[in-house]
Structure formats: structure tokens, C-alpha cells
């Protein structure tokens, strides 16, 4: 089977094919060879958004055509035996005590024989919750084995296991032993589906809808294929032609597919700087503007000091020089206990004084 395995992994899926097209191809191949590998099915269908009814329909089609499902490592349809290494941490992944305890705990659960699976499935059909729990517990290590393959895609190892367990529960609820498939074969699809869906929903900082993730994956496949064919990066127009999309839509999808970069990303050989240090704050004052503003404040204070206390305070309130809030003549009049007209007169006199060349020349340079 190893030769076939290599051939399968080297095959390029036409990115323009629909879900039904890919399913038909798989069924045709299964008819010729009498079986399909579970890994091949997962690889071909992983980029499509498939609901439970569609997947059950596909399994029914395989059963109707007498196509058996096998493991890629072993073309016989025997029970899958997980190695002790399947319960170890993935390379480069540190696990904490709760995860270590969980892996140790599920390692103590005995695996089921094919006959035991059938007996439990029969009891589950009768609504036996204990049988449902037993079937799920016996396959928890299968979830760990599959979750390890998705490490490094934006989710923690424990989160991958938890999502896979949700898929396992769904498989337990939907498993039909009458179709002739082993439970592990049936459950593997649902575990993979749950994990890949979670990665699409949760792994990104900015969530992208699953249907858009499928479109992005399709675009990436087209992009890679064109890169091989053309020997260069394809233009949006070329990608759009293959996908039957306008170039502007391709650019929009490529923009959505971009991953955000943290402003705390280390920069430099010694990681002593961060990306945010080199990004301009367009809302902040430039150093020259800030310096000019401070000089203006100093000059204005000096000029105001040449007025009487009442004139200075009236201007400060009228123009909001202290707190940025301007006041009406009436509001200022209430502060000083005089009429609006009197405040207007005081203000006019103060402004005339400021317009005198001896004072105005000190502020004129700031008028440009």
C-alpha cells in the first residue's frame, strides 16, 4: 500500500472541482480498487464544508458500492491498534500536569474488539447512555492520535483534543453498525471534521466564516498550482481566470487571508526592539509642532500677564485657554457678577491691548 500512498499524496486536486465532483472521483477509485483509505478521504475532503447529512450520504454510497475503508498503513480491514507513542506529546510541545494526567488516564481504558463495538452500538440504539459513554471512552486515545497531526495550526494541543472529543461524541450518536464500517473508521472523519472546523473558527485572531475559509483554501491551491505551472507568482487576474472570479474579488480574498501581526513582534538581532516602535502614530503631534505649541503657550502667558487680572481671566474663560471650553458672555458675566454687556466691553478692551504692536509682534510668528 506504500506505493499507492505516495501516489495519493502526490496527486494534485483540481481546485475548481466541487464537493460532488471529488466524491464521485473517490467512489470511482473505490470501485476499481475495492477500498479507499480513510486518510485519502480526509485529505480530499478536508477543505470542503461538509455537514453531517452529506457525510452520512457519502458513507451510504460507499456501502452501496461495496467499497470498504482501510487504514493507509495497513490495507487490511482489521482493528486499529494505537501504539503507546500515540499518547505522548507531539514533538516540541510542552504539556502541563492536567494534560499529562488526562493522557495517562485514557491510556488505562481498554480498547474494544469489533464484536464489543457492535454490542455497544446495539445498546446505544436502545438509548443506553452507559454504552454510549463506554464507546466514547474507548476511543479517546484515537482523538489524541488525530489531534497531534494538527499541532502548530494556531490552537493549543489540549484545545485540539477537546474539539476532537466533541467530534467523537457526535460519531457515537450517529454510528450505524449495520453499514459494516468499524467505529474507529467512522469516528475518525468526525474527529477530523470537528478539529478542522475549530481551527477555522478559533485559530485566527480575527475569525473568518467557514465558507470563506473554504474559498481561501481553494484560492491558495490555485495559487500554488499556478506557481508551479508558470514558475512565478501568479497575478490576481490569472488566479481569477482559473477560479472564475474578477481580479478585484481575488484581491479582496487575499487581503482577508492575511494574518495580523502583533505590534510586540521582536525586531532586530537581539530582539531589543518591537514592530510597534517603527510604526508612526499619525494622530500624535510631530516633535516640531509640539515644540511650537509649547513656545506659543509661553509667549501667550507672557502677553496675558501685561493685562489686568480681570481682563486676563475674562479672556481665559471666553476662549477656553485653561480647559478648552469656551464660555458665553452670559456665563462669564455670572462668574464676575456683572452683565453680558460689561463682559463684552472688558473683552473688547483686552483684545485691543493685545493687538498693539508691542504685544502682537510676540505672537505674529505663530500665525503662519
UniProtKB/Swiss-Prot annotation:
Organism: Staphylococcus aureus (strain NCTC 8325 / PS 47)
Gene Ontology cellular component annotations, sorted alphabetically: cytoplasm
Region (Sigma-70 factor domain-2): 135-205
Record text on subunit structure and interactions: Interacts transiently with the RNA polymerase catalytic core formed by RpoA, RpoB, RpoC and RpoZ (2 alpha, 1 beta, 1 beta' and 1 omega subunit) to form the RNA polymerase holoenzyme that can initiate transcription. Interacts (via sigma-70 factor domain 4) with the phage G1 protein gp67; this inhibits rRNA synthesis. Interaction with phage G1 protein gp67 does not inhibit transcription in general, but selectively inhibits transcription from promoters that require interaction of the RNA polymerase alpha subunit with DNA sequences upstream of the -35 promoter element.
Taxonomic classification: Bacteria, Bacillati, Bacillota, Bacilli, Bacillales
Biased composition regions of type Basic and acidic residues, renumbered to the chain: 71-83
Motif segment (Interaction with polymerase core subunit RpoC): 159-162
Residue pairs linked by disulfide bridges in the UniProt entry: none
Listed GO biological process terms: DNA-templated transcription initiation
Domain notes: Contains 4 domains, connected by flexible linkers. In the active conformation, the domains are in an extended conformation, each making extensive interactions with the RNA polymerase catalytic core. In the autoinhibited state, sigma-70 factor domain-1 packs closely together with sigma-70 factor domains-2 and -4, contrary to the extended conformation that is seen when the protein is part of the RNA polymerase holoenzyme.
Protein name: RNA polymerase sigma factor SigA
Amino acid at each position: 500500500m506504500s506505493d499507492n500512498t505516495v501516489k495519493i499524496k502526490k496527486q494534485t486536486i483540481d481546485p475548481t472541482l466541487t464537493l460532488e465532483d471529488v466524491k464521485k472521483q473517490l467512489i470511482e477509485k473505490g470501485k476499481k480498487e475495492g477500498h479507499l483509505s480513510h486518510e485519502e478521504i480526509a485529505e480530499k475532503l478536508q477543505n470542503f464544508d461538509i455537514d453531517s447529512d452529506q457525510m452520512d450520504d457519502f458513507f451510504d454510497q460507499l456501502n452501496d458500492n461495496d467499497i470498504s475503508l482501510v487504514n493507509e498503513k495497513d490495507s487490511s480491514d482489521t482493528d486499529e491498534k494505537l501504539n503507546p507513542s500515540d499518547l505522548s506529546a507531539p514533538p516540541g510541545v510542552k504539556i502541563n500536569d492536567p494534560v499529562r494526567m488526562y493522557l495517562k488516564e485514557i491510556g488505562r481504558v481498554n480498547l474494544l474488539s469489533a464484536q464489543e463495538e457492535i454490542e455497544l452500538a446495539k445498546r446505544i440504539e436502545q438509548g443506553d447512555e452507559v454504552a454510549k459513554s463506554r464507546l466514547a471512552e474507548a476511543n479517546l486515545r484515537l482523538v489524541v492520535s488525530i489531534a497531534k497531526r494538527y499541532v502548530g495550526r494556531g490552537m493549543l494541543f489540549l484545545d485540539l483534543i477537546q474539539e476532537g472529543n466533541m467530534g467523537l461524541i457526535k460519531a457515537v450518536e450517529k454510528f450505524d453498525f449495520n453499514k459494516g464500517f468499524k467505529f474507529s473508521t467512522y469516528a475518525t472523519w468526525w474527529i477530523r471534521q470537528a478539529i478542522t472546523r475549530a481551527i477555522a473558527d478559533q485559530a485566527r485572531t480575527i475569525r473568518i466564516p467557514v465558507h470563506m475559509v473554504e474559498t481561501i483554501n481553494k484560492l491558495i491551491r490555485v495559487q500554488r498550482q499556478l506557481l508551479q505551472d508558470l514558475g512565478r507568482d501568479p497575478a490576481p487576474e490569472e488566479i481569477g481566470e482559473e477560479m472564475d472570479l474578477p481580479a478585484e474579488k481575488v484581491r479582496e480574498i487575499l487581503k482577508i487571508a492575511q494574518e495580523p501581526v502583533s505590534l510586540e513582534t521582536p525586531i532586530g538581532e537581539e530582539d531589543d526592539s518591537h514592530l510597534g516602535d517603527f510604526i508612526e502614530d499619525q494622530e500624535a503631534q510631530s516633535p516640531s509642532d509640539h515644540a511650537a505649541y509649547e513656545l506659543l503657550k509661553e509667549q501667550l502667558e507672557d502677553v496675558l500677564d501685561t493685562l489686568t487680572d480681570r481682563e486676563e481671566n475674562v479672556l481665559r474663560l471666553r476662549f477656553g485657554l485653561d480647559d478648552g471650553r469656551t464660555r458665553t458672555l452670559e456665563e462669564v458675566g455670572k462668574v464676575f457678577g456683572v452683565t453680558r454687556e460689561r463682559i463684552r466691553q472688558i473683552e473688547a478692551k483686552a483684545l485691543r491691548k493685545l493687538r498693539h504692536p508691542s504685544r502682537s509682534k510676540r505672537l505674529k510668528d505663530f500665525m503662519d
